[in-house]
Curated annotation (Swiss-Prot):
Membrane-spanning parts: 22-36
Main location: membrane
Similarity remark: Belongs to the PsbE/PsbF family.
Protein name: Cytochrome b559 subunit alpha
Pfam families, A to Z: Cytochrom_B559, Cytochrom_B559a
GO molecular function: electron transfer activity; heme binding; iron ion binding
Assembly and oligomerization: Heterodimer of an alpha subunit and a beta subunit. PSII is composed of 1 copy each of membrane proteins PsbA, PsbB, PsbC, PsbD, PsbE, PsbF, PsbH, PsbI, PsbJ, PsbK, PsbL, PsbM, PsbT, PsbX, PsbY, Psb30/Ycf12, peripheral proteins PsbO, CyanoQ (PsbQ), PsbU, PsbV and a large number of cofactors. It forms dimeric complexes.
Upper classification of the organism: Bacteria, Bacillati, Cyanobacteriota, Cyanophyceae, Synechococcales
Superkingdom per UniProt: Bacteria
C-alpha cells in the first residue's frame, strides 16, 4: 500500500475489471429502463403530484394565466380552476 493510501482500489483498476462490467452491464440498462417506464407511464406525475402536460391550461384558455395580486395569488388561481 502506498503512503497516504486509504486502502481502496484505484478507479482505473475497478473500471477495467471484468467483474465491474458483468455487474454494470445489467444494472445500468435496468435503471435506464425503469426510469423510462416511470416517466412514460405517467407514474411520475402521480408520485410527485405534478399536473400532466394536458392539464396545465383549461380548454378555453390559450395562454398561461397572469396573477395580478401577489398576496392573493392562491385565491386567484383557485377562482380560475372553478
Amino acid at each position: 500500500m502506498a503512503a497516504g493510501s486509504t486502502g481502496e482500489r484505484p478507479f482505473f483498476e475497478i473500471i477495467t475489471s471484468v467483474r465491474y462490467w458483468i455487474i454494470h452491464a445489467v444494472t445500468l440498462p435496468a435503471i435506464f429502463i425503469a426510469g423510462f417506464l416511470f416517466v412514460s407511464t405517467g407514474l411520475a406525475y402521480d408520485a410527485f403530484g405534478t399536473p400532466r402536460p394536458d392539464t396545465y391550461f383549461q380548454a378555453s384558455e390559450s395562454k398561461a394565466p397572469v396573477v395580478s395580486q401577489r398576496f392573493e395569488s392562491k385565491a386567484q388561481l383557485d377562482l380560475r380552476l372553478k
